[in-house]
UniProtKB/Swiss-Prot annotation:
It catalyses: Hydrolyzes single-stranded DNA or mismatched double-stranded DNA and polynucleotides, releasing free uracil. The keyword Chaperone does not apply. This is Uracil-DNA glycosylase. Coiled coil: none annotated. The gene is ung. It comes from Chlamydia abortus (strain DSM 27085 / S26/3). The active site is at D70 (proton acceptor). GO terms for biological process: base-excision repair, AP site formation via deaminated base removal. Keywords: Cytoplasm, DNA damage, DNA repair, Hydrolase. It is found in: Cytoplasm. Its main location: cytoplasm.
Amino acid sequence: MQNAFTIDQLPLSWQEQLENEWSQPYMYKLREFLQSEYSQKTIYPAKDNIFTALKSTPFDSVRVVILGQDPYPGEGQAHGLSFSVPQGVRLPPSLVNIFSELHADVGVKNTTGCLQSWADQGILLLNTVLTVRAGSPFSHAGQGWEQFTDAIITKLIENRSHVIFVLWGNAARKTCDLLFRSTHKHAILAAAHPSPLAAHRGFFGCSHFSKINYLLKKLNKPMINWKLP
């Protein structure tokens, strides 16, 4: 586990931003917790995929942040990108709803659930908690991940401009309270969570995908190609 949980796993741009965070006491406690969990229980994602979001989207490349909660707890689902599943894996209900809204909004129809190409285009697909015990949602909440991902968001707020933060659900909004003091530098799109329990309360019809590209176009930045390969 030690090799999977070192800062040199990250792109240099993230290492520079998070170097001080890595040595904080809560990170040592989190490392010890994860070492115990991975050695005794089934934990998702695989160790090498814990930081896939940061590996896929370097700090200087982030244009959009889509915040999730914690990884999917089912076997073979989580691979380190929020809301995403590996190629060939059945789409979870939240992702089905995301794709339904995407199709209604911009006419793009996706059938594969791997969102890697979105990450490659500058969308940081970040969960607020990066690991989970198999079959037990939120089982790794309150162990330090929230503090770490808050630090990631804070670095983006302070050291980047014109990032589009997409907040789906109350948990994402709470995580990004800092954003509401930084709206002059960043854009915020908020809606209900895409889960079946909440999607009809404001996720469907939010048009976030077209709004993201509208904002990027205004900034003279390349728009996102939402079609997955």
